Swiss-Prot record:
Keywords tagged on the record: Cell inner membrane, Cell membrane, Electron transport, FAD, Flavoprotein, Membrane, Nucleotide-binding, Oxidoreductase, Transport
This protein's name: Fumarate reductase flavoprotein subunit
Lineage start: Bacteria, Pseudomonadati, Pseudomonadota, Gammaproteobacteria, Enterobacterales
Role description: Two distinct, membrane-bound, FAD-containing enzymes are responsible for the catalysis of fumarate and succinate interconversion; fumarate reductase is used during anaerobic growth, and succinate dehydrogenase is used during aerobic growth. The QFR enzyme complex binds 2 quinones in or near the membrane; 1 near the [3Fe-4S] cluster (QP is proximal to the [3Fe-4S] cluster, on the cytoplasmic side of the membrane) while QD (the distal cluster) is on the other side of the membrane. It is not clear if both of the quinol-binding sites are functionally relevant.
Gene giving rise to this polypeptide: frdA
Species of provenance: Escherichia coli (strain K12)
Similarity annotation: Belongs to the FAD-dependent oxidoreductase 2 family. FRD/SDH subfamily.
Length: 602
């Protein structure tokens, strides 16, 4: 097994991983940085993000407003000190991206343009047409090429991390092009591996988003936090799950049922706004969890449209006009034509909620470090405490760069002070990784990884979807336990050493099953409804701050069982209150302003 010596290893070369690598290179120009990715960096899932990235940019906006929107949007399960750090650093990172070449869309006067996004009181979403993720990733990738100390290991699949006496010491990866193993020694490792959306049947995620980093951390005793909170995006294309960005609604698109009725006004997000005049926190610009839940209610009422690919509602953009659509949403027009045969200029787009984002992830502190010294996690694979029970759109792209930078700087500092590990113990671990791989390749049985993966996706959709019941969640838990047993009998039929996808998909499935069990058990144990976790059983349909204003921590014990613990939520300045949107939110804002004025007048 070849060995490469580095100071810092970063797993994942999407937005978070690239930003961490750049920050590390800037913090210590002499540091050797290994950047490992199972795909070429520009194929990372960040490239699929369309809508935008949040940062205060206008005089009538403020850090306080962004903080409030994020905490309320997360249904008060956010770590408020983390949110405060985040909102204050977003503008700096957006400006830095521009200095590196990110082509933010502009107003006629040359100032940066910002669009409305759901759950936000004021428009603060920076965007580059409707390919924001692509432009951010391209900017970060080309910037990273300026630093020769960043050595890329493209198309390398990380099999496991190496840990000695509570401190990370490196990792073992497979060179997918050759089928050989490489040991990368480093005294700090940053996980930037993305979410776990592929454990669901229909999702907006790329094929690489399989929960690998979460699974590796879990196997070393690091808990996954708040895994019951999985966001459904309200507007995915039926069948494919391809995303129709929230920017569509930010520009003025509307959602209608089979009767042409704008149904969101019936679910606490009204009154109805004028056509083509979107209003922050109203109607289509409500938070994603509530907009997705409204679809479910319309489906139950029989107000959705039946199609061969499932029930849908319509996203109508026609009133925006051809010029605006081709200027602001050109990619959306292309996608709608290619995947559902619809020209948004002339017809409404069929959409339905689709699994989109993992709010939970690898538990970290406010500096992105886990319980294992030197092991950091950032981006969607992590739970730093930013999103709580429901993420606001455009906060995630900003999270990649704000916390990517922080993780890179902190990991560089940790690596410089780590000392040396037990060489014999580390080598023994690496040999163990190699042996487990051989055992998997030679495993005998009649099971097929693809069939197990499909059954997992269906089970997660049925039991851990938009609305949940104890019966369906238990059915999912039982099914996952069955699939875990069947996974032990998966047979790998491809014997090649070069790009053996049969082997790689099997390894991904193993991580996915472990992560899915954390999601299902965490959901069953949270006997309340909060954010993206909504229950229908009696006594659990409302938020319960007395018993469940706390984080769920899911551990995987040595015998394969999922064990749950809980930790407190950090509340600093904004105590829990009712989440309100639409006219109710305006009334609450007016009452708060009047109260402040009265106090000021003494």
């Amino acid at each position: 097994m070849q060995t490469f010596q580095a100071d810092l290893a970063i797993v994942g070369a999407g937005g978070a991983g690239l930003r961490a690598a750049i920050a590390a290179a800037q913090a210590n120009p002499n540091a050797k940085i290994a950047l490992i990715s199972k795909v070429y960096p520009m194929r990372s899932h960040t490239v699929a993000a369309e809508g935008g990235s949040a940062a205060v940019a206008q005089d009538h906006d403020s850090f306080e407003y962004h903080f409030h929107d994020t905490v309320a949007g997360g249904d008060w399960l956010c770590e408020q000190d983390v949110v405060d750090y985040f909102v204050h650093h977003c503008p700096t990172e957006m400006t830095q991206l521009e200095l590196w070449g990110c082509p933010w869309s502009r107003r006629p006067d040359g100032s940066v343009n910002v669009r409305r996004f759901g759950g936000m009181k004021i428009e603060r979403t920076w965007f580059a047409a409707d390919k924001t993720g692509f432009h951010m990733l391209h900017t970060l990738f080309q910037t990273s090429l300026q630093f020769p100390q960043i050595q890329r290991f493209d198309e390398h699949f990380v099999l496991d991390i190496l840990v000695d006496d509570g401190h990370v010491r490196g990792l073992v990866a497979m060179n997918m092009m050759e089928g050989t193993l490489v040991q990368i020694r480093a005294n700090a490792v940053v996980m930037a591996t993305g979410g776990a959306g592929r454990v669901y049947r229909y999702n907006t995620n790329g094929g690489i988003v399989t929960g690998d980093g979460m699974g590796m951390a879990l196997s070393h005793g690091v808990p996954l936090r708040d895994m019951e909170f999985v966001q459904y995006h309200p507007t995915g294309l039926p069948g494919s799950g391809i995303l129709m960005t929230e920017g569509c609604r930010g520009e003025g698109g509307i959602l209608v049922n089979k009767n042409g009725y704008r149904y969101l006004q019936d679910y606490g997000m009204g009154p109805e706004t004028p056509l083509g005049e979107p209003k922050n926190k109203y109607m289509e610009l409500g938070p994603r969890d509530k907009v997705s839940q409204a679809f479910w209610h319309e489906w139950r009422k029989g107000n959705t449209i039946s199609t061969p690919r499932g029930d849908v509602v319509y996203l109508d953009l026609r009133h925006l006009g051809e010029k605006k659509l081709h200027e602001r949403l050109p990619f959306i027009c292309e996608l709608a034509k290619a995947y559902v045969g619809v020209d948004p200029v002339k017809e409404p787009i069929p959409v339905r909620p689709t699994a989109h984002y993992t709010m939970g992830g690898i538990e970290t502190d406010q500096n992105c470090e886990t319980r294992i010294k030197g092991l950091f996690a950032v981006g969607e694979c992590s739970s730093v405490g930013l999103h709580g029970a429901n993420r606001l759109g455009s906060n995630s792209l900003a999270e990649l760069v704000v916390f990517g930078r922080l993780a890179g700087e902190q990991a560089t500092e940790r690596a410089a002070t780590a000392g040396n590990g037990n060489e014999a113990a580390i080598e023994a671990q690496a040999a163990g990784v190699e042996q487990r791989l051989k055992d998997l390749v030679n495993q005998d049985g009649g099971e097929n990884w693809a069939k197990i993966r499909d059954e997992m996706g269906l089970a997660m959709e049925e039991g851990c979807g938009i609305y949940r019941t104890p019966e369906l969640m238990q059915k999912t838990i039982d099914k996952l336990a069955e699939l875990q047993e069947r996974f032990k009998r998966v047979r790998i039929t491809d014997t090649s050493s070069v790009f053996n996808t049969d082997l790689l998909y099997t390894i991904e499935l193993g991580h996915g099953l472990n992560v899915a069990e954390c999601m299902a058990h965490s959901a069953m144990a949270r006997k309340e409804s909060r954010g993206a976790h909504q229950r229908l059983d009696e006594g659990c349909t409302e938020r319960d701050d007395v018993n469940f204003l706390k984080h769920t921590l899911a551990f995987r014990d040595a015998d394969g069982t999922t064990r749950l613990e809980y930790s407190d939520v950090k509340i600093t300045t904004l105590p829990p209150a009712k989440r309100v949107y639409g006219g109710e939110a305006d009334a609450a804002d007016k009452a708060e302003a009047a109260n402040k004025k009265e106090k000021a007048n003494g």
